[in-house]
Amino acid sequence: MQSNLLKVLGVLAIVATLVCFIFAALGMIGAVKVGDGCYMRYAPDGKGGSDSITGTITLNANANYVNTSKMLPDGTTQLIPDPNRYGEWLNTQVLVENNQPVNLQVVGQVSLCLAYVPKDNVQFTESTRPGKSNLDDKGNMIPIPRITDANNPPLSLIMDAKNNEWRNIAELYANDRVLVSVSPNFANTDATVEDAFKGTKVTKNCSQGQTSYEPICGKYSVYHGEYVNDCEWRDKYWKCNYHHSCDTSFWGGCGLGCPCAFGKICCGEWICDSCGAWVNIRTSMPEAYKDDGSVTKAWSDNINNLFFDLFNLECSNNSKTLPNGQCPDAVRDRSPKNLDFIKGRCSGTWVEDQCNDGTVSTPELSNYKYFWYTADGKGGKGPTGLIYQMNDAGSVSQALPSKLEFAKFVADTDQPADYKDKDGKYLYKVIYNIPFNSNTEKSYLQYRLWSPTSQDASKNTGGYVLNIKQTKCYRENGNSFNDTFDDRGRVQYIIVKPSENPNTSGKTYSPQGINVNSDGKYNFNANEAGYIWMKILNDPSNNLRDYKDSEGNYKVHFSTSLKVGSFTIKVMNPLLELFKTKVQGAATSIFKNMVCYKANDSSSCTNFFTYIKAILILYVMTYGAMFLLGFAKINQKELVTRIAKIGVVSGLMNGNTFEFFNNYLFDAITNFSDAIIANMSGYSLYTSTNTISNPFMFLDAVMSKIFFSQTFIAQLLSLLSLGLSGIIYFIITFIAVGIVIITALRAVAVYIMAFMATCILIGIAPLFISFLLFDFTRYLFDNWVRFTIRYMIEPVVMMAGIIVLTQLFTIYLDFVLGYSVCWKCALPIKIPFIGTILPIALLNVPIFCINWFAPWGMDYMSGMMGVNMQNIVALVIIAYGMYGYVEFSGRMVAKLTSAAGPSATEIGGRMSHDAGQKALSPIGMDDKTRQGITGRAEARLKQRNKTLDQAEKNRKNTPKEGGEKTNAEPPQPEARG
């Protein structure tokens, strides 16, 4: 036994070492993905006996998981998504059974399409750039960077103040995120803006002192022409006081009341006086821009505060009508009109151009001479004069709504940090960041610069630069919305057989949609067995353009709990039920055929009752004759014994013999072992049908864990995360588990052989019971009884010890591997001796880390996880004890029953040995191959020794130079006759 065990241990050690290094190599080079997520020791309900698996997958928005290398102009390579692999399903590596519950949570943000510059945008319309308002000079659509794209600045669109109409800046779908900002007012410097349509930078002079600016300068004016800037007094400016002149020589002149009816003779001619008047001093609008803000209008959301009409200001009434030099003048009134507003209010009296007995106040006009609106917005509230609206049609129009929405700067805390330069000055300042939450599928965000409707906007000057970032088709945490494509963004799943790949199978599947709650959580029961595959629903049209334009990913956290497959139900029950049925059927058939029980055709069998009757008659006649002739003496005890024998044997001649054996003795004897084993182990052997299942229920826990638990495999592999010591732990534990498996299989083989032998012995019971009659055949009956009892007891004795040892093994196995396991960084790679070269701070810093199964909470830096070597040693001792107890129990039963001969233990051990040799033969590890190798090695060694001996002899007989032999024997003297 010891030699066989050593062979088994050697084989298991070699296999374990190979498995260890193979998995370590695979983990290091990343050739396979052994697992992911976590395998929990206990289910969420705190109970064991199930695989509670948690895992996380990354679900890409573009549904592309294959990268290819692309050569860049500088000679370097870059990984890019394979252009032919968009829109594919992702295997989550979560294997489920039918009706298995799965809990998941979707976390993350994705953008499922890319925003492009819309038609009729703030820079060009279809009327100014027919058919190309949204295309660059090369005819391509112009993409808008996403909000999360920190590597690219926002897209700039130039807004000219001459365009007095609503224009689009963004096409918005449901739940879109948009960030509209305005470039600053470039004061006393040049402005440079990237023209999105030309693809080049545009630079213009924006320094102060000018009256006309390009739109990129960040300032505009709606004023043009001239306005009255000051008032000047002019004497004798116009002919005023139109009246008659009086003839003083007639009736004392006009003062005597000469009636005008007398005409010229009385009153004289019509004449005018020469009067002074305040005349307008005009200057051009707008006045030159100044950086000090003296000519800049403050931000306001009231149009009455935005514009003051300077066109209608006059120093005096009718001042716009110049004197014609005639009497009377074209106008009769040139009295002061806006003099106080323009010139200032005189606290005394104006005498011509002098303020007598008073002072002149500051002209109110100075408070209204604000000709410029700037993107900075004087006062810092927003870009002055910029208004916006939402329009579902996206059409260009000039109509103003009754209520205007003026753009404002968002709070400083909401301004992106990358929108400032290194000095903290804003490169762009956000004016709109409101998510588009609407029931409409699509709408447009429009902007325009405010301009008085009474004026010709084509004479305006300047403008603003609007900048935009837009995250289109935005979804988060697995939520979906309808836009131009129904249910865009819904996470879908299909369950596919392990042998299928839905991306290449060509089959049509019926995806199931995930309706997550507000936290992104969803629960479902698998509708079939297989792997879960997932992807995000998106518009597949236009050659998968939306998939190709998508960006971002979801983290899908899985948790599922599946009861570990029962070794008893999946393996032992089918095996033993089939075996028992066949063996019991064969045994009963033997019995029935021996007695021709209910045989319709007696020619097919020979009724053994006939022989029993003949033997019984012969026995009675012979013994009666001997008794009458005095050859046989009989006492009372012997008489009773012989009558009992005759009674038992004669009972076999009854036609109901088979029913008696089948209903009372057969099941009682064959199930004797099962019932006792069940009582010893404490496991019920009865199923819902109240029939005995099998006696190996005590193996269910440990064998189910070993063969069907994914958690156990992960726990075992996690020992490798301890490095070199972990390899030793892994090999020892693997060997212990292997010994237990072999022992369990040997126990099953012993049970099978004992059960089969018992059934056969019961099947031929009529034959051996008839041997009870004669003394010279009595030993056959006695041996039949001994072997029947031996094969009934042998499984009981064997299982009694294995039950105890199995329970101990299960406990210690949980001591060794009783922890949750996660796939994570487990084996850090560090630079050796770095502490002698670099500062001590870098001593424990890994260069990179190899992912592997590692215990929950394990610190990969220290590599400690608290494995107790005592428990591992105890595990091996228990496994070794189980292996040896199988043969020990066979010897024990042989002594107890005094039945010499083959035992079920020996036969079962031979069966398991032959099976093991068959499994080892393909790799050359079976006994026959090893003996052949050993024999050939011994033969080669013997041949080598012979060759060496022959070479030594030849060397001794080789003559030296000069003809002498080396090591030659001295010549013998010649014999004398």
From Swiss-Prot:
GO terms for cellular component: plasma membrane. Keywords: Cell membrane, Membrane, Signal, Transmembrane, Transmembrane helix. It is a multi-pass membrane protein. It is found in: Cell membrane. Pfam families: TrbL. Its main location: membrane. Disulfide bonds: none annotated. GO terms for biological process: protein secretion by the type IV secretion system. Residues 1-24 form the signal peptide. Residues 125-146, 918-977 are annotated as: Disordered. It comes from the Bacteria. Residues 937-967 have a biased composition (Basic and acidic residues). InterPro entries: ATPase_P-typ_TM_dom_sf (IPR023298), Conjugal_tfr_TrbL/VirB6 (IPR007688). The chain crosses the membrane at residues 612-632, 722-742, 754-774, 796-816, 833-853, 866-886. Belongs to the TrbL/VirB6 family. This is Uncharacterized protein RF_0091.
